[in-house]
Amino acid sequence: MKQNILKKYTELSQKSHLHFAQQVEEYLTTPEEETEDGSNVIDLPFPGNATYNFNTRLKDEDMQPLSISFMSYVSNIRHIDLSYNMLTDKGIAILSKLLEYAENIQTLNLKGNKIGDAGCESLSKALKNKAKLSYFNINTNVFGNLGLMSINELLYKNEALKCLNVGCNKYDWDGIISITSALKTTNTNLEVLNMDDPEYKIQDQHFFAHFGKMFLSNTGLKKLSLRLHMIRWEAVKILFHHLRNNATLLVLDLSGNQICFQSMIYVLDYLSKKSVLRSLNLSRNKLYDHGVKLLGEGLKTNTSLEYLDVTSNKVTDVGFVEFGMRLMENTTLKALKCFWENSWGNKSIKVFNDYLAMKGKEFYPDFTIFEDEQHELNIAYLETHMPNEEDYLVE
């Protein structure tokens, strides 16, 4: 199968006077792959950010010979990774003709290209009703509201879709509301959603009520990332108020927002009640000392949170003392990230040294505390990873 595809691809590339993509040849000369039932499978694993692909990233003109070459074996395609290439709507229109017949496709990664609204429309039409498509990543492209609305159609048509990454594009609330509406009324199958860094024309905190209402009725979503949404205290109040009635969301990433210490009273209220969140990322916000004090207060009685990130919040020695003393009463936290872009002092280092001794070996902080040559306690960064850490993060 691979030999036949390579022969066809070579002929078409030479005929079109195109640069021969070395990564395509290398993949097609590797041994055939088989599924458990013995059938052959074929992938398109050509990410442009791989070291050996960087200088031969795929362009629109490469899609024609590539798509035609694979068309004879389109039913064998399972995974396509064309991330970090140079594809625009023109190249995506050609790829979509292949995708239309790829009935067994399971994952599609188009992150880091230049796909606009028209490309999203082509993809939506080609991918609708694909019964095995479970993962779709179109992060870091250039589409806006119309493109996101086209992608949103997959939430109504593709029941197998579990992970959707549409972050870092140019949509605003019109596009976002189309997604939250689908998850509020129809779709209960999607488990992971990344909507990082939209391009707001108007930022009204009350629009986050659309996420809140989604929390009330959605029973499928387990992971949500809302990095870089300019979230302030009003939105925090809305989100955590509605989260109290949600029993399925386990991982929430709110890093890189404008969450201030006043917001933490609502987080405290949520955490101190019957919460289910297992992972909360509040890094790169504005919690300061009082914010982590309130956060620690909520964690005193919390029994669900296992992963917490509060790096880059300008916490000082005073705040860490208050935070650490409250963490002493928590029994479930397994991983704590708080070293970078905060300020430690002798008192807080002593408190956290006692905290680490209490937690024991099955704890994964991003710091270590040691005794220096002057027999004084000091702190340093330590990279640690808890088992199955990917379960606590959003891609």
Regions found by a protein language model. Give the residues of each.
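Leucine-rich tandem repeat or coiled-coil scaffolds
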Residues: M1-E395
